Regions:
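Secreted/periplasmic proteins
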Residues: 1-91
Length: 91
């Protein structure tokens, strides 16, 4: 996982929403918009539930791009990237 934020804050996401970098949202390549996903950082065991509202990540090898707010909760903000496990919770 990686995160994206300040440069995209206030822009439209692929779902048509306005991106809030402090929110608990994420970008995924194919999960339907509105899907809730538990993301667990394998380095520290911390988890956050996010809602998919955008498409990505664009960088190879990454399964999800988190908002800055979600990344901060699970400890990805400082490192920039982390190995994660995704659990799809539904809509």
């Amino acid at each position: 996982a990686s995160w994206y934020g300040s440069g995209f804050h206030g822009r439209r996401t692929a779902s048509g929403e306005t991106f809030n970098s402090g929110g608990l949202t994420a970008a995924h390549r194919y999960l339907p918009f509105g899907t809730r996903v538990r993301v667990t950082n394998l380095r520290n065991g911390r988890s956050v539930v996010v809602r998919i509202n955008d498409r990505g990540p664009c960088s190879g090898g990454r399964v999800i791009d988190l908002s800055r707010g979600a990344a901060a909760i699970i400890g990805v903000f400082q490192s920039g990237v982390a190995p994660v496990v995704l659990e799809v919770l539904g809509r």
